[in-house]
């Protein structure tokens, strides 16, 4: 059921802007929230370069945005893993999110984590 809803949302975005009119970007701007400390930050994340936020490791796999002549939208494919508090690199990394996030509709596909919140703001132009 969830896949059907996401598919419908993607088709709405694609019908409004042709699939080939999306522009790729090497960087995304994410808003991060630590729910325990209530600290909010806007962070740039580069393509294929893991970014550490608390116990989360965020990796941007793809970022795209629409050109100025169509309704504004940004979409990013993110992989987010919870690495815990282990110091060694061989610690178990649990994937907590792997999918597309949309700047205009953050509730459609979002990270569900008890401590952290991550939202896509935009892709760098």
Please give the residue ranges for each predicted region.
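Sec-dependent signal peptide recognition
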Residues: 1-7
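N- and C-terminal low-complexity/disordered segments
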Residues: 3, 16-125
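Hydrophobic core
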Residues: 8-14
